[in-house]
Curated annotation (Swiss-Prot):
Pfam families: SEC-C, YchJ_M-like. Belongs to the UPF0225 family. This is UPF0225 protein PP_1119. PANTHER family: ADENYLATE CYCLASE-ASSOCIATED CAP C-TERMINAL DOMAIN-CONTAINING PROTEIN, UPF0225 PROTEIN SCO1677. Transmembrane segments: none annotated. HAMAP family: UPF0225 (MF_00612). InterPro entries: NTF2-like_dom_sf, SEC_C_motif, UPF0225, YchJ-like_M. It comes from Pseudomonas putida (strain ATCC 47054 / DSM 6125 / CFBP 8728 / NCIMB 11950 / KT2440).
Amino acid sequence: MMSVSVCPCGSGNLLDACCGHYHAGTPAPDAQALMRSRYSAYVLGLVDYLVATTLPAQQAGLDRAAMADWSAQSTWLGLEVESAEVLGGQPEHSFVTFTARWHDQDGDHQHRERSAFVQHAGRWYFIDPTVGLKAGRNDPCPCASGHKFKKCCNNYLPKG
């Protein structure tokens, strides 16, 4: 049965014609579509989708319970995408800059982020800056690209 709900990502399209088919397993065509579908997944409480669309090498480090709690305890107020860009001549890497707004028991909040994404084997993945990647600069990249970490995802992680 088709949903008549408007997609939470802010596109104005119906959920089934927008992020819903990504939630059902169709790969997102680009990083912006993946980011929008991840926002929608937070709104809808789809923690399994959030985990599955995070870089596989980081998935074990995610706090599923905290993700579920944040999703359930927030009233999601909107998403604004500022830009989506491919940098460094590497089309399998992309940045999406966005602002997400929500309300919880502590009031209204907004979070602006420039998120990094990587494509591997036809699927885009979010590179979570809060979950470390255990790789030396000369090790194979955890995204499974076949490149060394220093020439691949290392350049897309925040420097601390």
